[in-house]
Amino acid sequence: MDIEGSPAHSIELDAPESPRLRGRLRSLPARHRGCLERMLAAVVEVDGVVGLAVGGSFIAGEIDEFSDLDLVLAVEPGAWPEILDRRQAIAAELDPSFLAGFTGEHVGEPRLLVCLYGPPLLHVDLKFVSLDDAHERVEDPVILWEVDGCLSAAFARAAPCYPAADPDWIEARFWIWAHYFADKIERGEIFEALDGLTFLRAVALAPLAFLGAGVEATGVRRIEDRLPAFATDLERTVGGVNTAACVAALESAIELYTELRKAAAARSDVEASPVEREVRAYVEGLPGRLGLSDRGA
């Protein structure tokens, strides 16, 4: 099936957006385009599936050879239980090059099937969504095929809502996290400490930076391209496989968080809470307790 002109998918070729969409599809890397073509040809034969849309980096035209495909499969509510049970089989029906897949409980999305196809190897996320719930979404995926406008109608019920960072939520947790990772450093659990620093970047620092810049993003995804100056600042929080480097990285993470918090509050006189004062003092004492007092000499 040709992805541009099949009567099976819902795009009206005389619609004004169709040439742009065709151009975007034509510009995809060969393996992404081939996978989409095979899936479009097959999805119309899957009982209970009534729509296929593509989201993620495709929406912004940012797919490159390293990108995955984020696909949404709309399911008739009555077929929902059976479709969930058959997700692995459906993944193989959509493209016979299916190698393996697992469900997305690790990211809080059990409707997701994380798949690997190939060769050539391609990561594809298949999100199976009941039409009853399809309006609840974080973005507007591009609909490639649907039955009787059902997915378009579902999306029209509500606007997408991207989960923005919540500075108050982060503040309520940051200092407890910082103390926990300080203890990991002092105990000598360096790899645990490095994991902790990664966590702070993904859950606190990068989300606040993206919030301040008005950019919708998850974790540190593509931060090098979207916020290059801040990405350079983040380098100070990476640490190394030794105690001194981890202490310096944690100190930098706290300093950077303080700057981001100040910007998020739109004022410079953010009063330190008791937990912040205690944890700051605790971290400031790390070099002395670890015999690193002369590290700057």
Where are these regions (language model features)?
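Hydrophobic alpha-helical segments and helix pairs
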Residues: 119-149
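Conserved nucleotidyltransferase catalytic core and NTase-mimicking acidic/glycine-rich helix/loop elements
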Residues: 2-4, 11-18, 158-297
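Metal-dependent nucleotidyltransferase catalytic core
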Residues: 18-47, 58-60, 66, 73-126
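Short aromatic-enriched loop/helix-cap "lid" or pocket-rim segments at secondary-structure transitions
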Residues: 64-67, 138-139
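A short, charged helix-loop
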Residues: 138-169
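Hydrophobic/anchoring residues in structured secondary elements
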Residues: 51-54, 128
